[in-house]
Amino acid sequence: MGYIKFQKDRKFEIVPIGRVAIDFNPTDINRPLSKSMTFKKYLGGSPANIAVGLSRLGKKVGFIGKVSKDQFGKFVVDYFNNEGIDTSQIKYAENGESLGLTFTEIASPTESSILMYRNGIADLELDVNEIDEEYIKNTKAIVISGTALAKSPSREAALKALELAKKNDTVVIFDVDYREYNWKNKDEIAIYYSIVGKQSDIVMGSREEFDLMESLIVKEKSTDEESAKRWLGFGNKIVVIKHGKEGSTAYTNDGKSYKIKPFPVKLLKSFGGGDAYASAFIYGILEEWDIMDALEFGSASAAMLVASHSCSEDMPTVKEINEFIKEKKEQYGEMIARG
């Protein structure tokens, strides 16, 4: 493929940075959250889900973050260890900060919402002194989550990781991952998103997330093509713009674009697909696949997740994704997602 050059012989292939949380998904679904009485606990947070997804796909994964110094923090570290994810750079909060909690609502397969508790949380207390240059130097790529930029000191820690990655030829993947919690205003969002977006190698986000990132750059909202040209012009090699059920498009720095559609599945929920998409797409990039193959792999993984109850726990393996793609193509035709 040749768009991204990864350094060889590094200990880790990918290291996400930022949010890790606990998801509580209702087991009594198809009703509003206020009516749900029973929930199942899962590991959550986009960077954490991406880490699990890539580890399930066979990659050597590390993680940089901070968790609560309690049973929930122990749950995260134990879960990562069981998944084969390195936890040496996961720090414990020392001042009573909690792990972020997310309660999800599955009112119907197409009506889902998320209630987050994000005040006084551990992941936003990650400090610049807790970012180890050797760790950044020893991975092929880092994933910076936009939520890590929402508040200090996590904001500065993420920016330090960005600078160290650029210094050490470590690829930077920016997953915009917008959550309204903790941000003061939209100007603040645009400023910090742009700082990372202008220095990353791959930037991934929804149309709405690109609009937020560009709100101080342009007078009117951009088209996908205009946004892609802008961020490729800043030095990104790949720009991925997602439109949910309408599919997504990857734009590359040689002027090409590649569009993928979702695979048809019976929806259980309308959240969680983005993290599966990101992990599987990044897997394809690490494997130096053609862009369309990486997009198809990501789209398939996303479809599998929105048909499942959890995010992290249901992340598929390479074999499972390939079997899913094969089954769907036999059922609907070779070009089902590529049309």
UniProtKB/Swiss-Prot annotation:
Which PROSITE patterns is this protein grouped with? PFKB_KINASES_2
Leader sequence segment: none
Matches recorded under Pfam families: PfkB (PF00294)
Gene3D superfamilies (UniProt xref): 3.40.1190.20, putative 5-dehydro-2- deoxygluconokinase (2.20.150.10)
Database matches in CDD domains: KdgK
Q: Which UniProt keywords apply?
A: ATP-binding, Kinase, Nucleotide-binding, Transferase
Q: Which reaction does it catalyse?
A: 5-dehydro-2-deoxy-D-gluconate + ATP = 6-phospho-5-dehydro-2-deoxy-D-gluconate + ADP + H(+)
Q: Name one GO molecular function term.
A: ATP binding
Q: What is its EC number?
A: 2.7.1.92
Q: Which InterPro entries match?
A: Carboh/pur_kinase_PfkB_CS, DKG_kinase_firmi, Myo_inos_IolC, Myo_inos_IolC-like_sf, PfkB_Carbo_kinase, PfkB_dom, Ribokinase-like
Pathway involvement? Polyol metabolism; myo-inositol degradation into acetyl-CoA; acetyl-CoA from myo-inositol: step 5/7
A single GO BP annotation from the record? Answer: inositol catabolic process
* Matches recorded under NCBIfam families: myo_inos_iolC_N
Q: Name the HAMAP family on file.
A: IolC
Q: Which family does it belong to?
A: Belongs to the carbohydrate kinase PfkB family.
Please explain the role this protein plays, according to its UniProt record.
Catalyzes the phosphorylation of 5-dehydro-2-deoxy-D-gluconate (2-deoxy-5-keto-D-gluconate or DKG) to 6-phospho-5-dehydro-2-deoxy-D-gluconate (DKGP).
What this protein is called in its record is 5-dehydro-2-deoxygluconokinase
